[in-house]
């Protein structure tokens, strides 16, 4: 009898949770509820930022996990572009069909410090070989974050011209 009561309670709780999430999803999709929480002022990109990266993680919520807790090699200057407030973070984490797909979402400006070093005229041809792409920056960040933290981060990087003021990619249709 005891196991029957506890499993019955579990099933009722699970059913209530399922109904609640379905109703909340329907309310958001129908436009009755809007989950737009902007907790920080829009920051201007640093002068030398050429890239913007979106980092999603199921375990690391704070931007410091990706800025001050990681030393990037080769040298990258990573600064926060946008971070969601606590309510939006929990929504992204708990609701798998949210924009975050069950993960905390943070965005960052990234400057490649080595590309900013002034070069002599003799270096001009060689400097083109050292120009990194957004995919190169993603690979560097992925290697450094996953070896120095336990964040298990999913990273996407874009050229700075291809993102909005929250460093999220803009669609080509806009």
Curated annotation (Swiss-Prot):
Signal peptide: 1-26
Glycosylation sites (chain numbering): 77
Entry's induction text: Expression is highly induced in filaments that grow at the water-air interface when repellent gene rep1 is absent.
Cell compartments where the protein resides: Secreted
Disulfide bonds, paired cysteine numbers: none
Keywords: Glycoprotein, Secreted, Signal
The keyword Signal appears for this protein: yes
UniProt keyword annotation of Membrane present: no
Chief localization: secreted
Function: Secreted cysteine-rich protein that might form amyloid strutures which are involved in attachment to hydrophobic surfaces and in formation of hydrophobic aerial hyphae.
Assembly: Secreted cysteine-rich proteins (SCRPs) are predicted to form amyloids.
Name recorded for this polypeptide: Secreted cysteine-rich protein UMAG_00792
């Amino acid at each position: 009898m005891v196991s029957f009561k506890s499993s019955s309670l579990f099933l009722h709780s699970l059913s209530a949770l399922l109904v609640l999430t379905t109703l909340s999803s329907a309310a958001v999709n129908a436009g009755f509820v809007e989950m737009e929480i902007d907790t920080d002022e829009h920051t201007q990109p640093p002068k030398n930022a050429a890239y913007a990266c979106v980092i999603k993680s199921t375990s690391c919520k704070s931007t410091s996990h990706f800025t001050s807790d990681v030393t990037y090699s080769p040298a990258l200057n990573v600064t926060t572009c946008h971070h969601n407030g606590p309510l939006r973070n929990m929504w992204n984490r708990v609701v798998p069909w949210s924009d975050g797909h069950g993960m905390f979402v943070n965005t960052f400006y990234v400057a490649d410090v080595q590309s900013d070093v002034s070069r002599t005229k003799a270096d001009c041809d060689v400097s083109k070989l050292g120009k990194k792409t957004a995919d190169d920056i993603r690979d560097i960040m992925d290697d450094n974050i996953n070896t120095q933290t336990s964040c298990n981060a999913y990273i996407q990087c874009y050229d700075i011209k291809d993102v909005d003021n929250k460093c999220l990619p803009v669609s080509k249709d806009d």
